[in-house]
């Protein structure tokens, strides 16, 4: 039995003083350490030197997660979403970032009106750490955790696990005390030098539970999937292999999940958006599906990806590769001369992409600047380009008519050398073909959501709710500081009112600052089982249908819509998918946020690696926020 277990056994019989415990159990230091840990966990209490088990009662406090830890304070995020609580260092009780805790609010905070409190219990400790191994004068090894670098955690004797000073490592807390200085850890995994962006990115993925490698049983299922399409499956699909269908992606894309076909008609346009039919291969009850649900999204950073599906599917049998027969889920739309959808239908199809289009090449073709060899590659589908341009212009007019938000944001593209070292950062350019594909995908997404809502299907919607009034007030104050008098008719502005402000600053020095401020006033889009519309796009109906290789919500509605197309209706459809839609919405929202943070932190490592080669140089920049 451990020393902690022995202490608990003694205290179960009666309260004890330290002297009595050490006489019975020996080893004064171990008894003291066990008592400190039991007190920090809220199991034992001490009063006037007498130790006793706490009575069976729930500790007081608000359920929270510790989200920030500095040397002398921390911040706890309330589970109810009512803001963050400041916790002074002496009141942290050794809590670490990621710990689920209870925090009791002070009746008299030092700052009137603020939320301050103390940790009363650690209900679910997070004992995993990622950080850098350092050595202090005297030779003792410590971990400087990435999430709280000021709070050094001592390594237990022999706990380095072969790691060297300066390495990025994963570690586990092996001992917790009431103070952070009492904690001890041991290295569980060595990534490599903290000077390497690649190794730091690996550590970040690990800390966010993003694994580029699949479990063996999942990999085995993927490897067992036949690459051919059974004739029995081909027989009941709409065969579109004779249509001039093609894909458009970046040159390096390997997981191609969308293709288009388009032609002008007497009354307008016929647009087909053809999406990889992942739901045919990833079935309920399989390990592939369980793993896809757990991941919920692919994570992209630098030149790497941690995929939602094994490459046998994502880059292979599901990917709409040029010249290969593929199963697809198609949205076939009829649009009028103004680009408005008049009708649509969804169908399980069999397609063959004529060409793997590349954004940069198609932009050149549309501009009339492409070389002849490039034009030859696209000769089978180039007849569709005129209709693409016409429909896109009509759709842009439709977007403006409904006052969809047009926020200008810039995204960096990392340039890596052959060794994987970042040697440049460029602004990612968006040409007209990128905008076209985005608009055509949006149409298919809107049609899918319209079907879900009007047919009352259990569903996963992409929801963007209207801005929070408090955030709008902050925006108004920021705009006033920029000399812009924002006068909204109601507490929440309309898309048109916000659009007028964006138009006012477009092309000026204030453009980026105002765009950023407006963006931050918005709610975060998420996935929900109820249709609530999309504020930013100014749409009543919206879902994600077009990327099932890399997003689980898309795969979810493919599965639901497939059963609906097969004739499943009413109570049976609800029985199969009502809870599934709720679970998929929650999981997809959580993992999307996690993926965004992972990607941002990983790419920051590469940007820092690039800037290290420019120490001492001067650059211009913008303040993007104050924390």
List the predicted regions and their residue ranges.
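Helical mechanochemical/support elements of P-loop NTPase systems and associated helical scaffolds
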Residues: 3, 27-30, 34, 115, ...
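A broad structural signal for short, well-ordered beta-strand segments within beta-sheet-rich domains
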Residues: 114, 119, 341, 420-422, ...
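Charge-lined substrate channels and their catalytic hotspots, especially those that engage the 3′ end
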Residues: 1-275, 279-325, 356, 360-366, ...
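Feature marking long nucleic-acid-engaging regions of large polymerase/nuclease enzymes
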Residues: 155-157, 249, 254-484, 533-569
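Structured C-terminal cores of nucleic-acid metabolism proteins
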Residues: 23, 29, 447, 465, ...
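Alpha-helix C-terminal capping/helix-coil junction sites
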Residues: 39-40, 46, 396, 480, ...
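Charged, low-complexity, helix-prone segments enriched in Lys/Glu/Asp/Gln
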Residues: 109, 118, 201-204, 221-225, ...
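Residue-level detector of short coil/turn "hinge" positions at structural boundaries
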Residues: 45-46, 212, 402, 459, ...
């Amino acid at each position: 039995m451990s020393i902690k277990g022995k202490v608990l056994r003694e205290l179960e019989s009666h309260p004890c003083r330290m002297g009595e415990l050490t006489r019975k159990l020996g080893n004064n230091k171990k008894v003291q350490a066990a008592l400190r840990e039991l007190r920090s966990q809220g199991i034992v209490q001490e009063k006037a030197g007498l130790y006793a088990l706490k009575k069976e009662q729930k500790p007081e406090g608000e359920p929270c997660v510790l989200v920030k830890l500095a040397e002398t304070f921390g911040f706890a995020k309330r589970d109810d979403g009512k803001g963050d609580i400041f916790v002074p260092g002496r009141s942290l009780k050794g809590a670490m970032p990621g710990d689920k805790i209870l925090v009791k609010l002070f009746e008299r905070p030092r700052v009137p009106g603020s939320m301050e409190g103390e940790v009363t219990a650690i209900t679910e400790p997070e004992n995993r750490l990622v950080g850098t191994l350092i050595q202090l004068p005297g030779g003792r090894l410590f971990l400087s955790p990435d999430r709280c670098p000021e709070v050094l955690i001592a390594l237990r004797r022999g706990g380095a696990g072969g790691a060297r000073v300066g390495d990025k490592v994963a570690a586990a807390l092996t001992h917790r005390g009431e103070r952070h200085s009492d904690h001890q850890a041991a290295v569980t995994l060595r990534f490599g030098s903290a000077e390497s962006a690649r190794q730091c990115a690996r550590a970040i993925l690990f800390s966010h539970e993003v694994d580029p490698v699949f479990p063996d049983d999942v990999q085995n299922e993927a490897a067992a999937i036949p690459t051919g399409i059974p004739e029995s499956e081909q027989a009941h699909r709409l065969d579109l292999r004779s249509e001039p269908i093609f894909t458009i992606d970046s040159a390096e894309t390997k997981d191609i999940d969308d293709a288009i076909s388009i032609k002008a008609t007497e009354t307008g346009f016929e647009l087909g958006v053809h999406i990889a039919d992942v739901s045919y291969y990833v079935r309920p009850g399989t390990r592939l599906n369980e793993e896809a649900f757990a991941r919920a999204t692919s994570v992209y950073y630098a030149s790497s990806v941690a995929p939602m599906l094994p490459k046998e599917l994502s880059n292979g049998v599901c990917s709409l590769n040029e010249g290969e027969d593929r199963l697809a889920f198609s949205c076939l739309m009829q649009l009028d001369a103004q680009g408005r959808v008049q009708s649509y239908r969804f169908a399980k199809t069999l397609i063959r992409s004529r060409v793997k289009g590349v954004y940069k090449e198609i932009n050149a073709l549309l501009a009339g600047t492409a070389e002849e060899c490039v034009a030859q590659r696209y000769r089978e589908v180039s007849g569709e380009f005129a209709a693409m341009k016409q429909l896109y212009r009509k759709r842009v007019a439709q977007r403006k008519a409904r006052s969809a938000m047009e926020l200008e944001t810039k995204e960096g593209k990392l340039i890596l050398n052959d060794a994987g070292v970042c040697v440049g950062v460029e602004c990612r350019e968006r040409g007209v073909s990128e905008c076209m594909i985005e608009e055509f995908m949006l149409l298919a997404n809107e049609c899918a959501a319209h079907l879900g809502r009007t047919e009352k299907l259990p569903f996963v919607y992409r929801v963007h709710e209207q801005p929070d009034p408090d955030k709008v007030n902050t925006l108004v104050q920021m705009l006033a500081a920029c000399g812009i008098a924002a006068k909204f008719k109601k507490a929440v502005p309309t898309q048109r009112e916000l659009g007028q402000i964006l138009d006012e600053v477009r092309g000026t020095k204030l453009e980026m600052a105002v765009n950023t401020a407006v963006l931050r006033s918005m709610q975060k889009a998420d996935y929900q089982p109820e249709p609530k519309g999309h504020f930013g796009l100014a749409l009543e109906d919206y879902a994600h249908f077009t990327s099932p290789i890399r997003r689980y919500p898309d795969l979810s509605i493919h599965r639901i819509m497939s059963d609906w197309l097969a004739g499943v209706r009413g109570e049976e459809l609800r029985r199969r998918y009502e809870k599934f839609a709720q679970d998929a919405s929650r999981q997809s929202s959580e993992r999307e946020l996690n993926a965004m943070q992972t990607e941002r932190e990983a790419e920051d490592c590469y940007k820092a690696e690039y800037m290290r080669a420019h120490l001492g140089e001067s650059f211009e920049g913008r303040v993007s926020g104050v924390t």
